[in-house]
């Protein structure tokens, strides 16, 4: 099962009105809008993606780190490009190579983050069960 299928299955399981995108090597591989979302969510997806690609960390973690440091720099330099709220999640290969981002929008930002983390966890678990843990996208 692909990562995008894990996100879709999780959204169906939780009856979550989300949109999501999977970005690999800078290119959007999948973008899906479920009931309850619309084109306005694209802005959130893009800002979360930009944050993850710049930092190689989750957008929620970037926000928590900025809050702890007492500074929103460098995220304030262009608020139209970045957002330090949950829902942008990094994708890493098992060998430690950064691959891209899974971004979710449509729920409270902490729920967006939780869903992304859970989808990546399920995907990694499934790859391990099928003997593919040494290649592909395995952890986030």
What are these regions (language model features)?
Residues 1-92, 97-101, 107-128, 132-134:
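Flexible, solvent-exposed loop/hinge segments and secondary-structure transition points
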């Amino acid at each position: 099962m692909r990562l995008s299928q894990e996100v879709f299955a999780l959204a169906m399981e939780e009856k979550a009105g989300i949109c999501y995108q999977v970005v690999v090597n800078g290119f959007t591989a999948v973008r899906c809008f479920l009931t309850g979302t619309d084109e306005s969510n694209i802005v959130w997806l893009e800002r979360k993606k930009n944050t993850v690609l710049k930092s190689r960390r989750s957008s929620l973690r970037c926000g928590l780190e900025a809050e702890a440091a007492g500074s929103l720099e460098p995220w304030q330099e262009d608020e139209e490009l970045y957002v330090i709220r949950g829902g942008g999640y990094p994708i890493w290969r098992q060998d430690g190579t950064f691959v891209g981002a899974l971004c979710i929008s449509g729920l409270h930002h902490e729920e967006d983050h939780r869903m992304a983390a859970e989808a990546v966890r399920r995907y990694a678990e499934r790859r391990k069960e099928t003997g593919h843990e040494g290649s592909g996208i395995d952890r986030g």
